[in-house]
């Protein structure tokens, strides 16, 4: 949620969106990225931010936890007239575990009178497609099929949601079917803000987190591969260039990939409906929704498009490096 740029508006309404947990190294993120790492002693940490967090072992992980909690407490102590505090990070869903939910509950219940968890739940196949685009933006190099195979646990929604339900109770967990047609102004931020009693927040703000198009994923993936072979870090500017030039619908799962995961989707879907189905807001997706997708939309991208992505990637990198050399004179 992109509420970080609207802190003053929120604060005037008695809502805090803390800065604690958003800064990693020299970058400030729109989400509370560090919170998950502070609440757990296990779980993956991307190598791209590992050094910035200063976590190398269990001892430094515990130190990071204490540091982050101190940051939150110091910021909370400064609030005046605040009745609601918002924490936001999709990784709290993606990497949900009993350990994370238990530690989060201990942290929150010691500081707040009431905790409400809001989850906007996207259809599993669309979630994988969207997350693949984010994977490539973050420097990933996998093909779509390889990414799906490695991240199949992402679509086990029951495993992602039930730890929170078990710790906070079903009445505190609000699951909303992600369909822009049913959101306030078709916007997630505006919809969430309205649930906090705010109108007009987010709807006019252009969403910066647009997905890469099919060609965009090919282009940026090849740029990532080029810098990997050079054993150097991809310049952030290249991500911005490709994101601006090649935004759009991300690659769809082709028929072969979809067939390999439909059983996993069905099992988790049935478990989710059996446990919290009655509390889901909005028209929820069904298995038939995914099975009815036209075959034409599930076709592989093709070798020609992949080759075009490689050609454009080389051109983008060459142009970028040429401009840097020219500016140095």
Model-based region annotation:
Residues 1-329:
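Anion-recognition interface
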């Amino acid at each position: 949620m992109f509420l970080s740029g609207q802190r003053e508006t929120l604060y005037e309404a008695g809502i805090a969106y803390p800065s604690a947990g958003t800064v990693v190294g020299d970058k400030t993120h729109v989400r509370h990225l560090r919170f998950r790492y502070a609440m757990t002693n296990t779980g993956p940490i991307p190598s791209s931010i590992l050094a910035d967090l200063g976590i190398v072992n269990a001892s430094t992980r515990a130190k990071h936890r204490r540091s982050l909690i101190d940051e939150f407490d110091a910021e909370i102590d400064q609030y005046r007239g605040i009745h609601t505090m918002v924490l936001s990070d999709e990784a709290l869903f993606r990497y949900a575990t009993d350990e994370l939910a238990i530690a989060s509950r201990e942290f929150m219940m010691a500081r707040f009178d009431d905790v409400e968890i809001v989850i906007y739940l996207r259809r599993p196949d669309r979630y994988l497609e969207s997350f693949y685009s984010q994977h490539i933006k973050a420097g990933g190099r996998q093909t779509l099929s390889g990414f799906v195979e490695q991240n199949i646990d992402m679509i086990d929604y029951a495993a992602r949601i039930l730890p929170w339900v078990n710790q906070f109770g079903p009445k505190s967990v609000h699951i909303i079917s992600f369909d822009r047609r049913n959101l306030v102004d078709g916007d997630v931020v505006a919809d969430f803000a309205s649930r906090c009693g705010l109108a007009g927040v987010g709807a006019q703000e252009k969403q910066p987190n647009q997905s890469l198009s099919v060609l965009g994923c090919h282009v940026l993936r090849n740029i990532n591969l080029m810098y990997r072979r050079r054993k150097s870090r991809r310049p952030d500017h290249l991500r911005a260039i490709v994101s601006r030039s090649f935004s759009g619908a991300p690659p769809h799962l082709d028929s072969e990939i979809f067939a390999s995961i439909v059983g996993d989707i069905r099992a988790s879907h049935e478990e989710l409906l059996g446990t919290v189905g009655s509390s889901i807001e909005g028209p929820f997706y069904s298995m038939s929704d995914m099975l009815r997708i036209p075959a034409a939309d599930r076709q592989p991208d093709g070798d020609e498009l992949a080759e075009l992505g490689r050609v454009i990637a080389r051109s983008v990198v060459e142009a970028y490096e040429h401009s840097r050399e020219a500016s140095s004179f």
